[in-house]
Amino acid sequence: MVLIRVLANLLILQLSYAQKSSELVIGGDECNINEHRSLVVLFNSSGFLCAGTLVQDEWVLTAANCDSKNFQMQLGVHSKKVLNEDEQTRDPKEEASLCPNRKKDDEVDKDIMLIKLDSRVSNSEHIAPLSLPSSPPSVGSVCRIMGWGTISPTKETYPDVPHCANINILDHAVCRAAYPWQPVSSTTLCAGILQGGKDTCWGDSGGPLICNGEFQGIVSWGAHPCGQPHNPGVYTKVSDYTEWIKSIIAGNTAAACPP
């Protein structure tokens, strides 16, 4: 079964594919407190929704499948139990930007959403934006995944701190073979460990895939159970959307996404 890795109102939506929003990293370890300065928590009155990534001091990038009403964003978070002094909370300033040509009936089509914050974020010890990519990663690249998603491949076991793991960029043919019933778009990245054991999962949706210090992917969807051999994750390819992102930030709200 393919899982869209999203938790909405604390429920897992069981679909023919699975979004990874609100997922944890499988097979990882606790992230270093200073290695996830761009990681953002999206939450509402029901609890945690998704992750996101700070890309400029007033802009957060996440997955479109994380779109929800009345959510807020928290930055600078490491432990759910111990507050960092520099944590900051923001509301969306306006309606989030989605691709205008996104298929409304396909939750993983053009799975990207850009959110403007109601006020700028100040860089600090635990908060800083992540660079957009200058080019896509090559097959074989080692990339970092991170999030508060479940650390169990089959049940919801959520950690108090984000977990991180290293995975590899794989050829698209691997994901197409793994998910023949779900189109794997060329505007996505296929990433994981062929032998399994490391993966994003429930609760990680919207979070970053970081390769060589650049924000290359957004956690979108994958298999359930998570972390199985030959069942890698599918990530929105950020490099294909950089012009759209820059256009929206510049004020062109009618900018088109790639086909």
UniProtKB/Swiss-Prot annotation:
**Annotated S-S bridges:** C31-C164, C50-C66, C99-C257, C143-C211, C175-C190, C201-C226
Q: What is this protein called?
A: Thrombin-like enzyme asperase
Signal sequence segment: 1-18
Uppermost EC category: hydrolase
- Please classify the protein's predominant subcellular localization into one broad category: secreted
UniProt source species: Bothrops asper (Terciopelo)
Tell me its EC number(s), please: 3.4.21.-
Q: Which residues are glycosylated?
A: N44
* GO process annotations (BP): proteolysis
Please give the subunit comment from the record. Answer: Monomer.
Lineage, uppermost ranks: Eukaryota, Metazoa, Chordata, Craniata, Vertebrata
User: Which ranges of residues are annotated as propeptide in this record?
Assistant: 19-24
**Peptidase S1 domain segment(s):** 25-250
Activity regulation remarks: Inhibited by PMSF.
Q: How is it modified after translation?
A: The different mass observed by mass spectrometry may represent 3 different glycoforms that bear a single non- (27066), mono- (27357), and di-sialylated (27649), fucosylated complex-type dianntenary glycan chain.
Q: Where in the cell is it found?
A: Secreted
UniProt similarity note: Belongs to the peptidase S1 family. Snake venom subfamily.
User: PROSITE patterns this protein is in?
Assistant: TRYPSIN_DOM, TRYPSIN_SER
Q: Which GO terms describe its molecular function?
A: serine-type endopeptidase activity; toxin activity
The alphabetized UniProt keywords are: Blood coagulation cascade activating toxin, Disulfide bond, Glycoprotein, Hemostasis impairing toxin, Hydrolase, Protease, Secreted, Serine protease, Sialic acid, Signal, Toxin, Zymogen
Show the active-site residues. D111 (charge relay system), S205 (charge relay system)
Tissue expression from the record:
Expressed by the venom gland.
- Which Pfam families does this one have? Trypsin
Which terms in the GO cellular component ontology are assigned?
extracellular region; secretory granule
Q: Which Gene3D superfamilies match?
A: Trypsin-like serine proteases
Region Disordered, as annotated, extends over: 82-102
**Which InterPro entries does the record cross-reference, listed alphabetically?**
Peptidase_S1_PA, Peptidase_S1_PA_chymotrypsin, Peptidase_S1A, Trypsin_dom, TRYPSIN_SER
